[in-house]
Amino acid sequence: MWPGLVGKGDEEGQEPPISLERMLDLTAAAEVDGQKYDGIDYFLFLPHTNPEASDDELKGIADLIQGKGFDIGSLVAPVWPGTVGDSAMGTEEQRGKFLEAVKMACRIAKVFNEHGARKRGVIRIDSAEFGVEKWREDTAANTGTIVSTFKEAAKIAADHGERLAAEGEICWAGMHSWKDMLDVLEGVGMPEALGFQADLAHTYLYTLGYNAPEHALVQEGYSEEEFWPAYEKMTDALRPWTIDFHVAQNDGEVHGAGSHDKTGKHCPADDPNG
């Protein structure tokens, strides 16, 4: 249900959010050569979900989703500042908010699981520290803080029978390059509880070293012959940790509405590069 919320808002150039029911109807109507969607991913925050909703309210949401013909799959924890959470690289208070967001996500997952609407899927997180400037002030210490926060989050998830997936995007500190992402995953060292979610556009940008030129595997103007071995090196490194996959909405060059580095957020459906 992400496209109904990401990049949406009341700022200049933004469209208003699309309601949950409308998103479900649009998804149910999507069909190509007889292929339809059988499930959805789901962001655990307003306006689609109040993360503090009662069990009965959550069961009502699950009924609505199942009534449209869908299972609930991966959940997106509200880890960012302005939602429930805050930076995984921040102060003790900020990190506490991050962990509280993971706890809330696990609680909602349990309700959906017991209801029967959710049978599989991960809980998606990232470092919730936008941009790499602050991270660069002390890379080792800041990565260490993220690792520590993610370890605690992974323990919470494991205690609830859940698995976290850190989505590698070039805008999130400590996760902004394939090598730095690998450092975090290996630093946590809990593959049964924390893995990697590959985003198709951002793994492409990982290969270019967009926010980490020192980790670039190809340069702009690359040939096909140069690109594929480089891409394979990146995928070989991250494959053992990869537990979820995000089909990108563009080719890594489109800038949609919103603030994500390079790719913006979700681009219009009729964009030729979409």
PLM segments and residue spans:
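Active-site-proximal loop/turn and secondary-structure-junction residues that shape catalytic pockets
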Residues: 3, 44-46, 78-81, 127-131, ...
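Short acidic/His/Gly/Ser-rich catalytic and metal-binding motifs that mark active-site loops
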Residues: 6-8, 75, 81-85, 125, ...
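N-terminal pre-domain/capping segments
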Residues: 1-119, 141, 151, 158, ...
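Receiver (REC) domain switch-region micro-motif
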Residues: 40, 123, 245
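Acidic/histidine-rich catalytic cores of soluble enzymes
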Residues: 141-143, 147-268
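Intrinsically disordered, low-complexity segments enriched in polar/charged small residues
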Residues: 100-102, 129, 147, 251
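Alpha-helix N-cap and loop-to-helix initiation/capping positions
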Residues: 11-19, 49-60, 89-101, 134-145, ...
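Active-site groove signature of glycoside hydrolases
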Residues: 109-139, 160-171
